[in-house]
Every structure is written in C-alpha cells, then in structure tokens.
Amino acid sequence: MTKKSPLISVIMNACNSERYLNECLKSLKKQTYKNWELIFFDNFSSDNTHRVLEKSKIKNLKYFYSKKRLKLYHARNLALKKAKGDYITFLDTDDKWRSDKLKKQINFFKKNKDLKILYSNYYVLNMSKKIKFLKHKSLLPEGRITDRLLKDYVIAILTVMIDRNLLFKNKFNQNYEIIGDFDLFLNLSKKYKIGTIQTPLAFYRIHDKNFSKKINIYIRELKSWISKNEKKFILSGYSLFQLKYYLFKLKIKNVIKLIVNLGV
C-alpha cells in the first residue's frame, strides 16, 4: 500500500451488538484494501459489545462510548466528527462486506474522478447466515437518479462510499432513527451524480430484533419526511406519488401483521 492510497474511515455504530459483531469485524479485517480506520461508536451498550471489539485486536481503531442512548443518525454524526478518511463508509454490526468491497470502490473512484457518491448491490442474509436472496435482480440506476429513488429507494447505506468533504458539508438529520440515509442521499442525488457497482459487495442481515417497533418508527418518520419535503420536491419537478403509495401499502401490511399476531 503506497502512502498516496486514500484513507477510508469505516463508521460503525453499535448498541448491544455482541451477537453478530465478531462476524462483522472479521469481514472488515479481511479487506484486501488495507488503508482504513474504524470509528466505533458504542451507543450506550450494556452487553459484551466492547469485549468482543477488544478481542478483535483491530489496531486502527477509534472507540467512543455514549453515556446515554442517542438516535442512530445523531450517533452517526458524532462518529463522523472523529473520522480522518478521504472517503467515508458505513458498516453496521449485524452486516458484513465482501473482502474486496473497499478496493473495488476505491478503484471505481479513481476511474471516475467526477463522482462523489458510490453504492452497490448486496445480498440479504437470514439469521442462520445463509444467503436468502440477491436484493436487486435488475440493473441499479446511476447518474442523476432522484426520480428513480423516489419510486424505489435502492441505496443501502452498508454499500455506500462517499467523499469526506461532501458528507461533512451535508450531514445526517440527527432527529432520525431509521431514514436518515434516505433523507441525505435523496437530497444529494438532486445535485450530484451517483455511481453504481452492479456486483453485490455486502451482506445485509435480517432478523427479528425489535422488528415491529422499527416498522412503526419507519412509518412515522417517512410520513413526517413526506409532509416536510413534498412541496420542495414538487417545486423541483419531482413527484412523490410512488413514495406516498409505498407508505400506504406499508401501513396496510403493518396493520395486517398486527391483526394476525393478536389473533383477531
């Protein structure tokens, strides 16, 4: 690795994350691109998260512990303040990366110097670590993709790599628990081209931890986002019809799930 190789800051936010953390950290340590630092923000964990992290013996680590539970995107912003990298990436503790994820993305940026944001396809894992499916079967959009994102938001934060300066000028809305990345990347897509690697470079894990609670928060945040941003996007020539329809379907599915669980 030459001295001119860009430094990558990997942002990892954790809250009682011992279950999958070791597997996640192993995927980071196996990266073929070695010039990275890990910014680990422990969001008031009460389990063995810190012990698992210590056992990993990651040398290029910056560890921070919050003395109170913060909303996720508030915690992400605080972690970002500690980052020194030229590029920023995000890896949550229940997910993992392919070993060449960072290398492929750095090489893509080198070949496309006008780009500031990049994402990729990914696999979805179930709780038993088995690949459940490839998330996106069709080609992912690239370039100016705001219209597409409003119809089908395809960017997963664990696949994103973004220019440090751009992210520091446009931080996450810290009031969000779930849709902070949606809010940020959608707004950035109006001003910047977004690059795509069609190859799946990450593994997103689905599990039942607080699932119903998270769905309710997601619906509430998305409804609030539409209310606050609809006029701005319409004035810019975009339609939020598909997004509102998606929210409607999500509400219906959640009600049905609740009825089934209650045995009504």
Regions found by a protein language model. Give the residues of each.
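Glycine-rich, basic loop-to-helix element that forms the pyrophosphate-binding segment
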Residues: 66-83, 104
